Curated annotation (Swiss-Prot):
Belongs to the bacterial ribosomal protein bS20 family. Pfam families: Ribosomal_S20p. NCBIfam families: S20 (TIGR00029). It comes from Caulobacter sp. (strain K31). InterPro entries: Ribosomal_bS20 (IPR002583), Ribosomal_bS20_sf (IPR036510). The gene is rpsT. GO terms for molecular function: small ribosomal subunit rRNA binding; structural constituent of ribosome. Disulfide bonds: none annotated. One of its GO terms (biological process) is translation. Binds directly to 16S ribosomal RNA. The keyword Repeat does not apply. The keyword rRNA-binding applies. GO terms for cellular component: cytosol; small ribosomal subunit. This is Small ribosomal subunit protein bS20.
Length: 91
């Protein structure tokens, strides 16, 4: 248990940041799920819109430090590849 005031404040700050980061991570997962659903449905237009939202949310999480930059880029790259595959299958 923290004894000095600085350590107690650090615990309070960490708790607040953890709550915010958890919400951000959850939001990213929600947008990724929407993209997955659009891909499963096979609707290229909806998937494209969902991809743009998911990419935006992932990069926002990267800029806030919730997700490592390489992880965010890798996920976006894989999502884009899957979207491209869907577009080519539809064409």
């Amino acid at each position: 248990m923290a004894n000095n005031p600085g350590a107690k404040k650090a615990i309070r700050k960490i708790a607040r940041r953890t709550e915010v980061n958890t919400a951000r991570r959850s939001r990213v997962r929600t947008f990724l799920r929407k993209f997955e659903d659009a891909l499963a449905a096979g609707d290229a237009a909806v998937a494209k819109a969902a991809f743009i939202e998911a990419q935006s949310e992932l990069m926002r999480a990267v800029s806030k430090g919730v997700v490592h930059p390489n992880t965010g880029s890798r996920k976006v790259s894989r999502l884009a590849a899957r979207l491209k595959k869907l577009d080519q299958a539809a064409a």
